Swiss-Prot record:
The 4 large subunits of the cytochrome b6-f complex are cytochrome b6, subunit IV (17 kDa polypeptide, PetD), cytochrome f and the Rieske protein, while the 4 small subunits are PetG, PetL, PetM and PetN. The complex functions as a dimer. It is a single-pass membrane protein. Keywords: Electron transport, Membrane, Photosynthesis, Thylakoid, Transmembrane, Transmembrane helix, Transport. GO terms for molecular function: electron transporter, transferring electrons within cytochrome b6/f complex of photosystem II activity. The gene is petN. The keyword Mitochondrion does not apply. Component of the cytochrome b6-f complex, which mediates electron transfer between photosystem II (PSII) and photosystem I (PSI), cyclic electron flow around PSI, and state transitions. This is Cytochrome b6-f complex subunit 8. It comes from Prochlorococcus marinus (strain SARG / CCMP1375 / SS120). InterPro entries: Cytochr_b6-f_cplx_su8_sf, Cytochrome_b6-f_cplx_su8.
Length: 33
């Protein structure tokens, strides 16, 4: 169960970082960390 949870969180972090890169390249400026 812990192994599955680890993979799920890893996938979530990966997806989040990809989304951040995509949003950052939009040049929108609304999302600024």
């Amino acid at each position: 169960m812990l192994f599955t949870f680890a993979w799920a969180s890893l996938a979530a972090i990966f997806t989040f970082s990809i989304a951040m890169v995509v949003w950052g390249r939009n040049g929108d400026g609304t999302i600024d960390l």
